[in-house]
Amino acid sequence: MAQGAMRFCSEGDCAISPPRCPRRWLPEGPVPQSPPASMYGSTGSLLRRVAGPGPRGRELGRVTAPCTPLRGPPSPRVAPSPWAPSSPTGQPPPGAQSSVVIFRFVEKASVRPLNGLPAPGGLSRSWDLGGVSPPRPTPALGPGSNRKLRLEASTSDPLPARGGSALPGSRNLVHGPPAPPQVGADGLYSSLPNGLGGPPERLATLFGGPADTGFLNQGDTWSSPREVSSHAQRIARAKWEFFYGSLDPPSSGAKPPEQAPPSPPGVGSRQGSGVAVGRAAKYSETDLDTVPLRCYRETDIDEVLAEREEADSAIESQPSSEGPPGTAYPPAPRPGPLPGPHPSLGSGNEDEDDDEAGGEEDVDDEVFEASEGARPGSRMPLKSPVPFLPGTSPSADGPDSFSCVFEAILESHRAKGTSYTSLASLEALASPGPTQSPFFTFELPPQPPAPRPDPPAPAPLAPLEPDSGTSSAADGPWTQRGEEEEAEARAKLAPGREPPSPCHSEDSLGLGAAPLGSEPPLSQLVSDSDSELDSTERLALGSTDTLSNGQKADLEAAQRLAKRLYRLDGFRKADVARHLGKNNDFSKLVAGEYLKFFVFTGMTLDQALRVFLKELALMGETQERERVLAHFSQRYFQCNPEALSSEDGAHTLTCALMLLNTDLHGHNIGKRMTCGDFIGNLEGLNDGGDFPRELLKALYSSIKNEKLQWAIDEEELRRSLSELADPNPKVIKRISGGSGSGSSPFLDLTPEPGAAVYKHGALVRKVHADPDCRKTPRGKRGWKSFHGILKGMILYLQKEEYKPGKALSETELKNAISIHHALATRASDYSKRPHVFYLRTADWRVFLFQAPSLEQMQSWITRINVVAAMFSAPPFPAAVSSQKKFSRPLLPSAATRLSQEEQVRTHEAKLKAMASELREHRAAQLGKKGRGKEAEEQRQKEAYLEFEKSRYSTYAALLRVKLKAGSEELDAVEAALAQAGSTEDGLPPSHSSPSLQPKPSSQPRAQRHSSEPRPGAGSGRRKP
């Protein structure tokens, strides 16, 4: 973007220099006094003066733009200021120069010319900061003088901050009576980022009274001559024409411009040139690029120039009006060049002589128009540093035409990635209260004024540091055409919707909550392709949006889905009830279409219910199942309208049959429901009457004789069984370990994929004791023949012979026994059957197994114990409790990760620990006579310690033999044990369980000869 330096002449003209051109001083122009070091780095403002009504009742406002001073080497032509203080702070520091304004989106501003002196009705920067310089009143201005622009300095102005003095550029003084000020009392107090400003009460003191006769001759102004580029001038001119209209000369009917009379030459005037009073221009060197622009955005000037004509047509058509709405005033004409020599801003030293000849050209290059006179006492709080544009004004109803056009232009650039700020957010400035603070901030509006889709709102601006200044209620003209265009824009909006105004109202400034717009509902955001997607396809893809939302009923889609559910096309039986049990219109349609595939004509209610339940798995929550049964009852009543009196009666009777089935065939403990109870529970439920008694008796008998069975998902059952039997399953499932097993996870069986088969053969099993050595009921103790398979740490019992790779049935899996921490011993005390051995598991269940031969019995015992010794993981320590009741610790079912050598050492350590604990327990029981429950618990603990000692002893002995054999084959272990010739170490005889041990007799039984008669037999006959 082209940038150039803009310098303002004393007549209000401007000249544009090329970007970053070297600066040099005019030979005639004095060099301004440099500001103190404390002023550098501060932020200044380009402001527009706020004043009261002008000659025609027009009011003006004031706006600031943040800027930062640039510094350069001092010019050798520094002249001491006649009013400079003697303090060191008043001396010009090195590196200061005149101020140049870099133009970038600066509005039509009233640039106040100050040469270190307070303007009429205002204060200089140094006085705002607490300076002590005496005020200098200025002479009266001509009638047309207040049309020129002024540049008022900010904290960045090259003025002394403490004890500030006037610039040395004004060396000619004019003596005469003071003229009344033309601006408001508080219209020009300085704009400070920290919110400081001179109070209006000090103005009278600062300006002095009528007796003051010292005035400044502002004829000799200083400037910073930079090379003027015609391209930069065209850009500046185009910017002004884009924002504020054409620069064509006023019409022939306009009043000719008035010129102020020249002031008499004052003291110290150079070459006797007289300059108009108040015409000394003070420049502020500012570069907006060096300041964090809080409320400004950039755009491409080339793109803006392309759309200039459209904006010009919208702006120039508005009559300039700052009075009441509906009153228009023609634009004030621009004055011609004032008499008297003045330094040219467009040339260097060589162009000084052509100053007066180029006056008319300077007028043509004028960018800013003059400002009107101001009314004193119009102090208003500053809303924001957002510039006020001519042609715009706050409105309580909406934006004006310029705002609409400008927002339309910015909207087109928003799509190109450029962010803008609305310039019409001025509504809250209309009528501030007299008691309000002079400073406040607001956030810029994120929404455009047109009824098009709202763009994403930018992040709210941080609270800005308040710049001192004022603004009037009617800063820009408000025309009737703007109201008409706004009315047309509102008429195009939908009924009942307010247009999103780009201006901030009081509510948007924190005084109230006002929604700026509403987003469309989420349902409208669904694309047409999604809405047209077939419901069946949604369900096939696993989508439940149609079912969950449920208010869009599609009969054709429901028919297609019902057909697929009935034929199980892409669905399982478990999915049918889920689709029929939803509480929405679409699911009701699907259920109605699904039940049409069933014909219940001529069937009793229980028969129809059995047929229906065979086709689907009645699953889900209670309310979902009740909805499915309601659909069934409706269909049954349609097929058999004569069987029952109403549809509600059919539904009531259907639910009663389901409850009766649960009561008669469930696992509940208690009294079963009788036929009389069933009939009595249904009294008065048939639409206020009773059901036929014979019907209820028939239904009760049918349910009692044959329970209702609904379909089970056979696919799920087959998959679970196949995964359990698969040698390489993807998912390992845990199955319950045997009949009567506890719910502990340590007792569950985990099929081991790829486990080795150590032995298989025929076995006959008898359950001798349930977990915790509880006696097995008599009806479950019988002997049953199986084919045993020792695979890993699980002993599988099958009905048929072992076949590698054969899948196991559910019954065979339930009969499986885990041998972790188990011990197999010869049942020497059992004499009813030969070749019987005991198998005691980790949960203290006891099984009796009968082998075909003695060798097979010995082989089963050896291999079961060796496998348990190799893979049983070390147990956890026993639980610690304050209770005296003994409880066995749980033993882990997972395989150990220790090597066989480490496993042997672990078993030997546990053997020593169990032996030591058993000795301590027996020593503690000496001399005590336990009674009742306490004695029984002590006996259980002693039996447990004895069993654990025997088990670890067997494990350690067998692993030592296996390691000595040096082979992983169990046949080698059996051969080594056979060569030892003793089974006492590896297979000691034991009883089935401690609770089943025969109690030893307190007195030894005396042996008697067979010929001796029994005691107490008397003379009875003896058997021969």
Curated annotation (Swiss-Prot):
Coiled coil: 898-924
Name under which the protein is recorded: PH and SEC7 domain-containing protein 1
GO terms of biological process kind: neuron projection development; regulation of ARF protein signal transduction; signal transduction
Purpose: Guanine nucleotide exchange factor for ARF6. Induces cytoskeletal remodeling.
Main location: membrane
Keyword Transcription part of the UniProt annotation: no
Ranges of biased composition (kind: Pro residues): 71-95, 327-342, 445-463
Highest taxon in the source lineage: Eukaryota
Biased composition (Acidic residues): 300-313, 349-369
GO molecular function: guanyl-nucleotide exchange factor activity; phospholipid binding
Originating organism: Homo sapiens (Human)
